[in-house]
Design a protein with these regions (language model features):
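Residues forming the flavin
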Residues: 1-146
Length: 146
């Protein structure tokens, strides 16, 4: 969710629209429309760009406590639900420290968002060494910079 600035994404979307691509936003496939309905509407192809996959839970004590959430939820609440605003229906809890469990690109995005949200110290907790982290080196570098 942090990989590209919104202005770049908006520019790329405009380029696609100029080529005749129809972009449908605010659509929850399965609730607003089904894939079958899209084909019935005349679409010949459907690309679902839903971002990162479902979160993986570790089934450990404490993972359902207040203040613990998946990176997907955290990033969605910040980017789409404006949870960084105090008047948000579901504001993000502000803390002095945050632990991000995982070593992938989404974990790096969550760590960077936590810093941007004012968290003093962010720890990335990963089961292996830094060299084995699946996050792109560029993502790791940006996370360390922030």
């Amino acid at each position: 969710m942090l990989s590209l600035p919104k202005a770049i994404v908006a520019n790329e979307v405009e380029k696609l629209k100029a080529q005749g691509v129809e972009v449908m936003t605010d659509m929850v496939i399965g609730k607003v429309l089904s894939i079958d309905e899209l084909f019935e509407m005349g679409f010949k192809a459907v690309f679902i760009g839903s971002g990162a996959g479902l979160p993986m839970f570790m089934h450990i004590p404490g993972e359902s406590l207040k203040g613990v959430c998946s990176a997907n939820e955290y990033l969605t609440r910040i980017n789409l639900m404006k949870a960084y605003l105090e008047e948000s229906d579901t504001p993000i809890l502000h803390s002095k420290a945050a632990a991000i469990v995982g070593g992938g690109n989404v974990a790096m995005d969550a760590a960077r968002c936590a810093k941007r949200m004012g968290t003093d110290k962010v720890y990335i907790v990963y089961r292996r060494g830094e060299a084995e982290m699946p996050a792109r080196l560029e993502e790791q570098h940006h996370a360390k910079e922030e």
